[in-house]
Amino acid sequence: MKQVNGQKLLESLGNGVSAIRGRITPDAPMDRVTWFRAGGLAELMFQPHDTDDLTTFLKLVPEEVPVLVVGVGSNLLVRDGGIPGVVIRLSAKGFGDLELAGEHRIKAGAICPDKNLAAMALDHGIGGFYFYYGIPGSIGGALRMNAGANAGETSARVLEVHAVDRKGDRHVLSKSEMGYGYRHSGAAKDLIFTHAIFEGYAEDKAKIRNDMDAVRQHRETVQPIREKTGGSTFKNPEGHSAWKLIDEAGCRGMMIGNAQMSPLHCNFMINTGQATGYELEYLGETVRQRVMDHSGVKLEWEIKRVGNFMPGYEIKEFLGRATA
């Protein structure tokens, strides 16, 4: 397996990087970025100053170099061998804007926390956004995966999405062009979302506040929100609840190394100490196999897994055991 070498990649970009205003970091530790606090190095991390800076940088990066965008790292599992190519981490200064965009409309930057969108909607009496108060992560991730909770989801509120493609060209996508499905967007995978326009409706602030309080109380009661976790580990299969399938297969509280399926909510995987990316993914694949053996249902990952395995620590998908 090729090891990451950020300095070499940075030098290959040439003199054009002198025009970049954002931060470029070779061999950046991803365990400082993700909520799991695990994983290897990013070969090169770029934090753009704004959208113009992002487009300028992307035009410098050769087409064969992979590019991965991360938000706040809430739904991301990085493997221990690191991430080859460029990791783009959007900054709050350039991509965290949150402002009114017309009657019952809000413009939100991709790195804006989901709960902040809910809070602004409350401040202005705009209904339809309460569910974001219970979703960890940022708007960019919500746009990509059609995030939802408590009977609400992103596709019901989004009007248009602004993005930059791998070549640095800008695009504006309508809701239909986003191709939304359950926890899925059909938008091109190379698109980097920069901001979006959302639309709600007039609603009494007291009603919105009550709905948000109910979401908060539910999360605090049934989810391990103070642990190092990436949120829901697996999608709910049609007609089933993932947590119930995991529980019935005897996997509540299961541990591999320092990785554990939370005893509080067994569809939440947590890092109880210094878990490696290998331990976390190995645990997840073991749970998938046990659920299949018990119920015949195949769980699909909701958490995004990226990067390379360390040599000798490869994991076969859906077998839950190392191939080494």
Swiss-Prot record:
Pathway: Cell wall biogenesis; peptidoglycan biosynthesis. Its EC number is 1.3.1.98. Its main location: cytoplasm. It comes from the Bacteria. Residues 36-211 form the FAD-binding PCMH-type domain. It is found in: Cytoplasm. One of its GO terms (cellular component) is cytosol. One of its GO terms (molecular function) is UDP-N-acetylmuramate dehydrogenase activity. It holds the Pfam family MurB_C. SUPFAM superfamilies: FAD-binding/transporter-associated domain-like, Uridine diphospho-N-Acetylenolpyruvylglucosamine reductase, MurB, C-terminal domain. The active site is at residues 183, 232, 302. Cell wall formation. HAMAP family: MurB (MF_00037). This is UDP-N-acetylenolpyruvoylglucosamine reductase. The gene is murB.
